[in-house]
Regions:
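Glycine-rich phosphate/pyrophosphate-handling loop used in enzymes and phosphotransfer proteins
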Residues: 1-196
Length: 196
């Protein structure tokens, strides 16, 4: 994303980098949360374009943007597998791709990590960012199901944006109920509870 940019644009993007990779907010059932950027400015626009219009340019520079962060996370944790926050199959009819899944795939290939899809989204839900906190909780009831054996596994869960953490909390709960040892979350951007 920062490729082929002028010096001023590159500096503007650098300002959106989070000073601390660790997210201090604790999300239920999640052992630790990391995020690389603040969800604002060019990063916010880039994610929205990637999610809803043009993923190619975002994904082409994605690993350049976050490789150092992932290396640090891998240095602090031992993971058995990397997974993505799953989308309902109906989303593929509209966009033909799932951004977190593509992110997880690239991370697993770059860092030689096992990439599995143990969790599926079995219920079509409303878009989270359009809902209030209590509505978000209700929206995700019975939305996910674990379909692969993840007993005693340490999992890195990938998402594009986190704020209230409802989605990753529900997924982490299902993983823990299925026997996962630890669930650590990394998101490209963190929004301090204002979106998603």
């Amino acid at each position: 994303m920062a490729d082929n940019l002028c010096r001023r644009c590159r500096a503007a993007l650098a300002k959106e980098k989070r000073e601390n990779l660790t997210v201090e907010t604790k999300f239920e059932f999640v052992d630790k949360t990391y995020a690389s950027y603040r969800y604002e400015g060019a990063r916010r626009k880039g994610i929205q374009n990637a999610k809803f219009r043009r993923p190619a340019s975002f994904l082409n520079s994605f690993l350049t943007d976050i490789s150092r962060d992932i290396e640090k996370i891998l240095g602090e944790n031992n993971f058995d597998t990397v997974i993505s926050s799953p989308a309902h199959k109906s989303k593929f009819y509209k966009t033909e791709y799932d951004l977190p899944e593509q992110m997880a795939k690239r991370i697993s290939e770059k860092f030689s990590l096992n990439n599995r899809r143990p969790v599926v989204k079995i219920k079509k839900t409303k878009t989270q960012h359009s809902l209030k906190l209590e509505e978000r909780k209700a929206n995700l009831i019975d939305a996910f199901e674990v379909r692969l054996d993840i007993k005693d596994k340490s999992i890195l869960l990938i998402d594009d944006v986190i704020s209230t953490g409802q989605t990753v909390s529900v997924i982490a709960k299902e993983l823990k109920l299925a026997g996962a040892k630890t669930v650590v979350v990394w998101a490209y951007a963190y929004n301090d509870g204002k979106e998603k």
